[in-house]
């Protein structure tokens, strides 16, 4: 056991106790907690341009706020964010904008989200109860370091990240910077130090250097990643390049630009020489927990991860966006982060509901107001309420609301496709490691193709059964009946498909850490990208 890591972890958890206790109390006081947050935003930002325009100073209730401030999307903030990027202030928040954090967008190639100290604090208010609850349920995690994934740079250096030398900085230097101040500094001491690897453009070099640092930490206790395939691809590289990686640990790696050297560790390399790369428990015997996305389409990827790490508990993350921290793992559920932001939810009748008005079993679209200056901002995330913790709704992510494929009027939504695949794949393709439904327009009449990677040959009935499920969408069935679409096809792809999928999105400007697992892509051309032929569904 690393005494240093243990001491720092205990200090870090001690610092989280206040946030944990406040969150526990708030679970039974949803309405006053949320109303206090909203009134605080209005009072603090009444003198801003946005606050004056919408009369923040005279708003006295949630209803008045909803009447005066319309629902918003990122497009409503573009002009303000461009001014913030140039160094202006007092536009959306009274608090100074410390940086603009890049994230992917549905209509924009990339969005820049304003981060203030208030917003950092709001993220911290969700992280504190999550981490403290985790320590209570698995105290062994406090005995050693953790790895929280970072991702390679989204753009070439000097292109957009951090390029505003006369205005507001773009991007944080590390994931722990989300917390800000001394908490971020303390959190950083508990982690395997990989922050400098974010400057690497080449994905293979990024994985190599990440693995060398992880392999050097024999006492690793926890791994936190976003996309489950981020970790499975690391594990694939671990097996494929085992000999070279052990040599790298023994000799060390030289620095490269902003990336520091990895020190030589021949003693650890001798330990690794006796380990089995296909059994991570022989490499990290005290690794007990992996945290990753586990709702929506990501749920279909968890079984493969669990097979690779049979001794490790996989904890699904809450719903976390760059803009807001929506829910967190706590007490075996995923309650709303009610101490972090003011939440609203749009129901199927287009009515705005507050957090204390939600009903179990119902589905909603998430709307947030945050300390970063986003007001009634539509995240376009669909959730369902699966229970309550105290009086606070526990939610589960269903899919992106604005991910709809519509070549001929069929209007297939990602949320619905994810539900279909979650029913079919465990029965007809139980060892699936990758699955993506996407439209193809080359070769005549367009069709949808299910690209699937599986350790076993999918059942012959998969294509026909999937076609029957898709035909339950009357628009899709109508397009097929009219000959506008061919029936769905099933194409088996190799194990590298997940990596090719991530690389295509990354080349399009997406950051690996921001890519959520998705059941449906609206992009065409995956057939060529995967380099394969596709047969009709009923021949699959």
Indicate where each model-derived feature is located:
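Contiguous, well-ordered alpha-helical segments that form the cores/surfaces of helical PPI scaffolds
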Residues: 98-102, 323-326
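Active-site cavity-forming subdomains of large catalytic enzyme subunits
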Residues: 134-185
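Conserved small-residue
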Residues: 108-114, 147, 159, 165, ...
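Glycine-rich, histidine-containing beta strand-loop boundary motifs that form or position
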Residues: 101, 114-119, 150-152, 224-227, ...
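Active-site glycine/GP-rich loop and adjacent strand/helix microenvironment
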Residues: 1-52, 57, 65, 69, ...
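A short, flexible beta-alpha/helix-coil linker loop
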Residues: 109-110, 155, 402-405
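Active-site diphosphate/adenylate-binding microenvironment
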Residues: 32, 36-100, 112, 118, ...
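Conserved adenylation A10 loop of the ANL superfamily
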Residues: 100-114, 234, 490
